[in-house]
């Protein structure tokens, strides 16, 4: 088992990682335990009561964080004609069709999010093996295949997060930076939970949100008592 560094040990001193806390306390303790000198990212992991091997239990979606994510998001837009000018006017870092696909085939990947208009998806499919594994492939289910590129770009820039459960039924998402403080992190977490709850599959049985943990880039995972999540949402 790997040994943790001195900063990590000092930060977690007095923190019982076996205890499950309220959502508010878990966030506060996670922020207080962030050991690094840089502004760490705060993340959440949520274990859902779904079986992703069944397509009707795959939970996938997107949410625009009300308090942003505290980082610059570089957006690439696959589009043609007038849409290219619209994309650049809306704040896209790069926009185009054939020439953009060719550039990516050559190894260029200097962007964080990708959007495409429906009419160029056949072209984008040529680089699916490049974009897919990196989570960059535009997808209609998450609103990144659309003719309304202005709205999509603005949402991306504002802190839009796409998520889906992994094979174990766990969903991971960033909530912002440690410097945000508890209030802004909790606001983003509430928006995420609201969205995930709306996406609950009708075929999912039993407890939907089975476990949750809050962590920072270099910090420990602080567990949340799942029975208190509803109280947090309604509070």
From Swiss-Prot:
It comes from the Bacteria. One of its GO terms (cellular component) is cytosolic large ribosomal subunit. Keywords: Repressor, Ribonucleoprotein, Ribosomal protein, RNA-binding, rRNA-binding, Translation regulation, tRNA-binding. Disulfide bonds: none annotated. GO terms for molecular function: rRNA binding; structural constituent of ribosome; tRNA binding. One of its GO terms (biological process) is translation. The keyword tRNA-binding applies. The keyword Oxidoreductase does not apply. It holds the Pfam family Ribosomal_L1. Part of the 50S ribosomal subunit. HAMAP family: Ribosomal_uL1_B. Binds directly to 23S rRNA. The L1 stalk is quite mobile in the ribosome, and is involved in E site tRNA release. Belongs to the universal ribosomal protein uL1 family. This is Large ribosomal subunit protein uL1. It comes from Nitratidesulfovibrio vulgaris (strain ATCC 29579 / DSM 644 / CCUG 34227 / NCIMB 8303 / VKM B-1760 / Hildenborough).
């Amino acid at each position: 088992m790997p040994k943790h560094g001195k900063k990590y040990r000092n930060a977690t001193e007095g923190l019982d990682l076996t205890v499950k806390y309220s959502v508010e306390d878990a966030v506060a303790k996670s922020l207080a335990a962030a050991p690094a000198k840089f502004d760490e990212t705060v993340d959440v992991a949520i274990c859902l009561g779904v079986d992703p091997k069944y397509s009707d239990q795959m939970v996938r979606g997107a949410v625009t964080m009300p308090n942003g994510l505290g980082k610059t998001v570089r957006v690439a837009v696959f589009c043609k004609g007038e849409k290219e000018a619209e994309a650049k006017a809306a704040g896209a870092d790069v926009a185009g069709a054939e020439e953009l696909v060719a550039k990516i085939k050559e190894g260029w990947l200097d962007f964080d999010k990708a959007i495409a208009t429906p009419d160029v998806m056949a072209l984008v499919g040529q680089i699916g093996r490049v974009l897919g594994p990196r989570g960059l492939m535009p997808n209609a289910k998450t609103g990144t295949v659309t003719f309304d590129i202005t709205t999509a770009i603005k949402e991306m820039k504002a802190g839009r997060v796409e998520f889906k459960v992994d094979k174990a039924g766990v969903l991971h998402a960033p909530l912002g930076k440690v410097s945000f403080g508890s209030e802004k992190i909790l606001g983003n977490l509430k928006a995420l939970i609201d969205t995930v709850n709306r996406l609950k599959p009708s075929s999912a049985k039993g407890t939907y949100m089975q476990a949750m943990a809050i962590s920072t880039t270099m910090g420990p995972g602080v567990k949340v008592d799942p029975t208190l999540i509803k109280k947090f949402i309604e509070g």
